[in-house]
Regions:
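Active-site His/acidic residue clusters
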Residues: 6-8, 24-69, 104, 112-113, ...
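Catalytic-site neighborhoods of secreted/periplasmic enzymes
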Residues: 1-12, 105, 191, 212
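C-terminal cap/loop subdomain of S1 sulfatases and analogous C-terminal strand-loop tails that border
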Residues: 103-113, 117-124, 138-143, 147, ...
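Soluble non-cytosolic domains of exported or imported proteins
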Residues: 13-21, 64-71, 145-149, 170
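Loop/turn elements at helix/coil->beta-strand transitions in domains of secreted/extracellular proteins
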Residues: 33-40, 89-95, 128-129, 187-189, ...
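Beta-strand elements within well-structured catalytic alpha/beta cores of enzymes
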Residues: 37-43, 70-73, 77, 94-99, ...
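Histidine-centered active-site microenvironments of extracellular/periplasmic hydrolases
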Residues: 50-52, 59-65, 69, 82-138, ...
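Short, solvent-exposed turn/loop segments enriched in Gly/Ser/Thr/Pro and often Arg
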Residues: 40-50, 97-103, 172, 194-198
Length: 232
């Protein structure tokens, strides 16, 4: 079902139209809140399985349904950016693109490039994802950072940038806004621990990553990610 807040608004929506409906709601939210600080979290269903895309994108795609779903996200992004510019708040809005995991198998449309593994695994192909942050006039266009971070760090980092106040209860994120600016590469995170459900599968310290277990079987594999990002 399609749910808004706690209300079911449609039991069996046409999933090919979901991107357009999400985008319409996002634009309406921005319009109604443009004169005040706002937070918008937009998590498209594309390109998650099963793949559904509007017919107009399928007809234009050179990479099947997967390419059509990517095109629908591109379209949605352009609509939202146009709205921010139309309202005059484009340069006062931080936009973050990120993913919660790596791609599936390549024969399902996605690709993790040289990274080993896929979604659901603790190899870099399942864990390392791009993050693009846009803030016109504040974050230099084309700047890059390979400092290690996680989506848990967004809350304290953005809170600092907007001069907000964090909740008093303990949070897991670390303030990482230094990585947003001027090709900064120094991360405040030295240690990463990788679990697959209840199994501790890998530990990373700085550039070194030790794999301990995969699919219930113990292994001992150590990689220098600075020189071997593909864990070969």
């Amino acid at each position: 079902p399609l749910i808004r807040d706690k209300e079911v608004i449609q039991e069996q929506p046409d999933q090919r139209s979901i991107a357009e409906r999400y985008t319409e709601d996002a634009v309406n939210f921005i319009r109604h809140n443009s004169e005040n600080p706002f937070f918008l979290y937009l998590a498209h269903m594309q390109v998650h399985l099963p793949l559904y895309a509007a017919e107009k994108f399928v007809n234009e795609s050179e990479n099947g349904d997967y390419g059509a779903c990517v095109a629908s996200i591109d379209w949605s992004t352009s609509v939202i950016f146009d709205e921010l510019k139309e309202l005059g708040i484009d340069e006062n809005t931080i936009v973050i693109f990120a993913s919660d995991n790596g791609s599936r198998l390549q024969n399902q449309g996605g690709s993790n490039g040289d990274l080993r593994g896929r979604k659901g695994q603790t190899w870099e192909g399942g864990q390392r994802v791009p993050c693009i942050i846009r803030w016109p006039g504040k974050i230099e266009q084309g700047s890059e950072s390979d400092g290690i971070t996680t989506t848990m760090d967004f809350l304290p980092s953005i809170t600092k940038l907007i001069e907000g106040k964090l909740p008093s209860n303990k949070i897991d994120g670390i303030e990482m806004s230094n990585l947003f600016f001027s090709n900064e590469t120094i991360s405040k995170r030295d240690l990463f621990i990788y679990y697959n459900e209840d199994d501790l599968e890998a530990i990373r310290y700085k550039n070194w990553k030790l794999h301990l277990k995969k699919e219930g079987e113990e292994i001992k594999e150590l990689y220098d990610l600075k020189n071997d990002i593909g864990e070969k």
